[in-house]
UniProtKB/Swiss-Prot annotation:
<comment type="similarity">
    <text>Belongs to the UPF0329 family.</text>
</comment>
<protein>
    <recommendedName>
        <fullName>UPF0329 protein ECU11_0030</fullName>
    </recommendedName>
</protein>
<feature type="compositionally biased region" description="Basic and acidic residues">
    <location>
        <begin position="358"/>
        <end position="387"/>
    </location>
</feature>
<feature type="region of interest" description="Disordered">
    <location>
        <begin position="358"/>
        <end position="444"/>
    </location>
</feature>
<dbReference type="Pfam" id="PF12376">
    <property type="entry name" value="DUF3654"/>
</dbReference>
<dbReference type="InterPro" id="IPR022115">
    <property type="entry name" value="DUF3654"/>
</dbReference>
<dbReference type="Pfam" id="PF07753">
    <property type="entry name" value="DUF1609"/>
</dbReference>
<dbReference type="InterPro" id="IPR011667">
    <property type="entry name" value="UPF0329"/>
</dbReference>
<feature type="compositionally biased region" description="Basic residues">
    <location>
        <begin position="435"/>
        <end position="444"/>
    </location>
</feature>
Amino acid sequence: MIGRMVGLEPSSRSGVLEECRECRAIVMKGDGVQTPLHKGDSILGGEGACLMRYAAWTLISAVDVVYCSLETRESVSLTFNPDGQVIVVPFMFKGYNIAALPTTKFGDLKKDTKQIENVVSFLRSDICYAVWEFLVSSVQYKDDDRFERLFDERMRGYLRNISEGTSKVYMRGNKTFSELLEMVCGRMLECSGRVAGGGGIVRYGRDVMRMLDDMIENPPAGMSEEEKKVYLEDWRSAKEWGGFLYSIERWERIAEVEKIVCNACKEICLGLREEELLGLLAEGGMKKTLKEEFSEDKAKDARYLEYIVVDDVLLLDAHREYGGEVTKELVRQMLLGKEGKDIDKRYVDRVAGVVRERQRKREEETERSVKELVGDEEKAKSKEEKAKSKRGRKGKSASAPSEQEEEKKESEVEEAEQGGEVEALPVEVGGARSKGGKKKSKGGRKCFKIHRRVLRWTKSPEKIKEEWDKGSEERWKGRSLEEIKEQKIVHDITGVLELLRSEDADRFFMDAGKYRKGGSERQRMVAIGALETGGQRMTGVVEVGTFKDGDGCPVVYHLRFKPTSIGSIGDVINPGVVEASDVGRVDEGEECEDADKFVYPKGVRFETVKETGSFQIVWKNPSDTSEVLRRLIVYCRPCVI
């Protein structure tokens, strides 16, 4: 009776409304999909929102371009959820990948010449409809199209004008995608006293309520008393839930929350380094799955907005009580996967405490840096005074050597203080000694074996090429020596196993899911990283693929650093995409080496460096250890409160 329809492709309507045999709810049926629209469900988020939601990112939309109008060919299953208000977030996806960030300007979108026509069409014609479906949705009735005709008459042109007006402003190039979404929501939900009749959305709400009153007062003829009773109960319930449609207070509150969330998302993206933004999107993406009803072909072409579900009153109160930093952290936690139903006043206070502590540490760090700067200036001044005094003396004094020794000691102390900020664990392999502090207990360390196809990359390029050419994997046969040298840079990272086996591994690696291929069940883990080599720095992910041997021990058969842009992080972490590109069959019978016993070939030198938020593997020139050949940095996962 009342519910949300979500379009997939613009076409004639094929979905019909029927009554559910079990609960007498009205059910939309279309192409084999049933959408229960239960009595009392509202067309909005809030008290009784019809939502399809996931922990972090929530899909609800269309193939190719989002058409959240009433012209639909298929329907998508929606889940009744009373936990909060739908708030659209300024991220646009295409398939599994980011198409627009909150900071994206139209000039950035124009770089994708293949997709720009679809993007422009969406912005000019449909973005307002998409937001409408998230925030308001549509009223349906199984016996006639009176509500559709009302929407066409009152709202279709109104929303189209908003889309055209806001898209023109955005396409001038100065606004970000976050500011575009804020404009759309602000104009669509405009209902202040400055607008005649309270604004388009309020006028539409009043018309809907008048139509509901008419249906209650004039039930269809020929009904039995029992049928009439059920009919009146349903429509009175619908009227009760639909009353918010003309609530000026509600729409003003939602518009304010949308503005706060859009601004928070923009600030989050502006304040993050590239690898941190990759981590945020990857962590949220792990908890996002395209709806099962979509085929793989549809999933990869879908263009859609996404939203979070949250108690809008609570979020607004938190913003007023604690300010923008706490609101920004709350939004960040929801992007990382925190569910709106788990966010209450106690959680808000907890987040506020974390933000205060973070600010305190930042202030202490700033104060310490200032003191160090002042100290350095004083030391420099003292050295200069000593030098002047020395030049003023006649001849060489007997104390000169001792002054030089004193300066040398001061320099050594400074270096030791600076070096104390990180824990360095240099390891020389191939029979040489191992340096470092105390050996850690093996408690909590994980067991791994290394497959021969991973160990192969530790050899010389010539030997690698020879073995691949003789092997069974077609993808590697016939590669040139230059290609092998390039691939060795991203595959020869076996030092990562030191981190993978440690008890801290879960702080760095995300579980990217399991799947079966080539007759074995495989598991995949990813971590955000950066590779520095040849004067270049590449951000991306460290991929680890494993299967279990006969004893149940994980065997690492795939290990690689994959350069990854922000726009393609979705494909990198999506199990379906990974499965399709994974090696067809792995020879599980090959002899594997215990990771604890693995050593690099003689002459290779690397060291691992643990810092607060990262783990580094540094490869050095064996002939000159001051020369760094490569550096792989693996970053900690974002903090989830």
